[in-house]
């Protein structure tokens, strides 16, 4: 196997190479590296090729350790939702991981963190138990043998719910939980409407996100961060905004990122008012319909508890997302 690695400096080269790989991720896209570059990270992009064809990619984010902590001149390296490659190709995986390890040593990094979208277990259907993934288990064992250490610090969600979009709309509806279908129809009867959004809606989106964070007990970043995190992908054609309105006012919204064959439900927000009209159910369905019409193959609900445990703080989120008929749950 003659694998050549090169550094990429052009957006079109990077995104087209990335899109040709299995399961490319939005967090490995050029625009996401540009977003992070505004917040202390430097993005370096590597492509591995064999016979002139891209076989792997890694967008490596690097930053210096924050001042005032023990190693002020040292660096940390992070490959969000990467590297991207066919993990069943053990020789390729070994070459990619070896190159990344060498980079960390050359830069004298405190650590190098990777979190590839590698399924360790998958469940089919809304109520089935996860089944182990042979490839995931093999890669996990190989990483342990190579002195990689499982991190206790979660950056991205370990688990997610996915919906295949190959079926027609009637079949997608039929696969939903009956209560979810009912709530979609209820929202329509209650006069909820869904429209596309733009940057002119950002102030309203951030206000709703703040209201959601207080109600659900999570912390959000300053407004300026979201102007970049939402605006850059939107301008690059990698994001779509949906707003559900009741009586002419936004009651809920979501921001969908998309790259390659996949859409990700990255951000959701809602007001406490009009929740009885079920705007979030119709909103989600319209986003799914758009993703299908756009030719995407997978809708990723982006985030779920590792186990469907009613005592888990995220169980309510899981139940809402699972109601749309997801077909698999992978633990990364």
Question: Across the structure, where does each feature detected by a protein language model lie?
Answer:
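Aromatic (often tryptophan-rich) hydrophobic motifs at membrane interfaces
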Residues: 98-99, 227-332
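The substrate-binding groove and active-site-proximal loops of carbohydrate-active enzymes
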Residues: 80-88, 129, 275
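Conserved GNAT acetyl-CoA-binding A-motif
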Residues: 106-123, 291-303
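Short secondary-structure subsegments characteristic of cysteine-rich extracellular domains
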Residues: 91-108
